[in-house]
């Protein structure tokens, strides 16, 4: 049975990447797979917050769009929001139950976190461009074209 903390003293440098002992103390000083720690550090270096970006110009630009441009812009936001809603939780749900490498576990959690930032960035755009972002959010799951396109990737 999977546990969130294994009390055994385990040498994870001798464990397989998947299907080994459940993880215990998160150690980031000794690695069997150092590439995952390097990837994790690289991802952390790209940290940003969507709110740091002013969208005042974008709001004005959107107001000047023709109807077909607004449709393309909004459809893209719907599509990206749907995909990153999956990607923001997918890697952890799919892989963490089977991971036995602390460095890979950390890399997957960071990956999920950054996908969530992407998703939050689409919310930030919608809150700044549309008078009522709910009008966009509430139509994502009713948009047959967006759903059809997303099924290719989900």
Sequence positions of predicted segments:
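Extreme N-terminal leader/anchor segments
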Residues: 1-56, 63-65, 69, 100-106
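Exposed alpha-helical structural elements
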Residues: 35-38, 43, 61, 72, ...
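Charged/polar, solvent-exposed surface patches and flexible loops
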Residues: 38-41, 45-46, 75, 79, ...
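Long, hydrophobic/aromatic-enriched structural stretches that serve as scaffold segments
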Residues: 54-110, 114
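Carboxylate/His-rich catalytic cores and anion/metal-binding grooves
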Residues: 109-141
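Long, K/E/R/D-enriched contiguous segments that form extended
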Residues: 140-150
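Conserved small/polar residues in nucleotide/adenosyl-binding loops
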Residues: 152-154
